[in-house]
């Protein structure tokens, strides 16, 4: 019963993976336009989300995480990191700055810092909020953030389109590994969207089996002689450098202390939508 009341009493913070969320809004809705011909699909999705805060979920604090311009340590580690991202549709680019300016006008705080990606900002805020004993809701469906899911400390992802919580069970159901094992899993399978090389020839099933057997990437390589399948062993030996590089690339930095003055992140009480009308 005590733990029940503890959870009821817990303060909660909502962290939005802003670009990820806006991209998804854009592709989820038909290409809407205003009567002047300005594209509005992404902005409509964003407003629906803001209107749902308090209805779809309750939160005490809220923050919008953004990518900083320029490169990060990942580009220094690996020149090709995110090098082949497809071109972003013009309509989407037109709406992004408007959405960001609305976030600020509505009185929400933006988390951005040079050298950090939005995912690193999310990881940093989640870590500090967890240490404060908060419930942490990360608005994103991005698998790169699955490593942060932590049922024991009430850290989970929230898919705003499906209005669905993504917890440890959902992670295991989808990928066959726990959130704590997710970095090692990604290091093996790689990620074509971000140009993470992974181990060439190792797919999801093999990665799951290896992690189930050995737990971590380091442990896999320490026990390389115990791997029965000759082909898998060969692929791992050939891909060792890429595996460890990939692990560095997918590991989120969580050392950017951003919420020391937590009151700045209180959810505004007034109707924020009126501020942009």
Where are these regions (language model features)?
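Long, highly charged low-complexity segments
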Residues: 272-277
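C-terminal, charge/polar-rich interaction regions
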Residues: 212, 265-271
